[in-house]
Amino acid sequence: MTQEDRRTALASLAGIGLLVAGCAKHDVARKGGDDDAVTANEDLMREHGVLRRILIVYREVAPKLLTNAAAVDAAAIAVATTLFQTFGERYHEQMLEEQHIFPIVRKAGGEAAGLIDALLAQHARGREITSYVLDRTKSGRVGTGDAQPLARTLTAFARMYEPHAAREDTIIFPAFKKAVGPKGYDELGDQFEDIERRTFGGDGFDMAIDKVADIERRLGLADLSAFTAPAVA
């Protein structure tokens, strides 16, 4: 293992440690009563909501990299990408979708099953992109020669993941729920929650929401009203 590989591995492990530490503050059961119950698909889709907020970060910083890369908080991009890697790729994609949901949907057949290969290919491409982004931002600054390819890559990643998550929300997850039936759906929902708590040491969703909100504040993206479309001329 090269010195560069060691630094990358240590940074990744540090990211996981931060996520677990953050979860310790949110270790409160989500199923304290019927009103607090979270179904499997609701949980999956709100996890997508966290990841979509990271995509917004990517979309917003990309043009800024092209105009003044030195002014961009590259460390905040690295934190956002680490969150996508730990919460999105290693937990949501690998532990839930790839180990449980996709095999069930593929076995059930139909339209949803026909999407699985493309979704898996996009997961793999996303992980390649995540490694690239971390490599270009881990120093806390973006080099002049890296600004344009990084901006292009962030935009391409967001473009890929938006339809990816939308298909999962509207086709894959409903097919999964139908395939397992009411009893299996409830049991898998409990299993997914157990996986989340074992992985993060607490409520991973609450932790991720806190972290993404902090990233948005650092990058000046916390004001929702700033995204309101202008009036039609």
Regions found by a protein language model. Give the residues of each.
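Small-residue-biased structural context
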Residues: 1-233
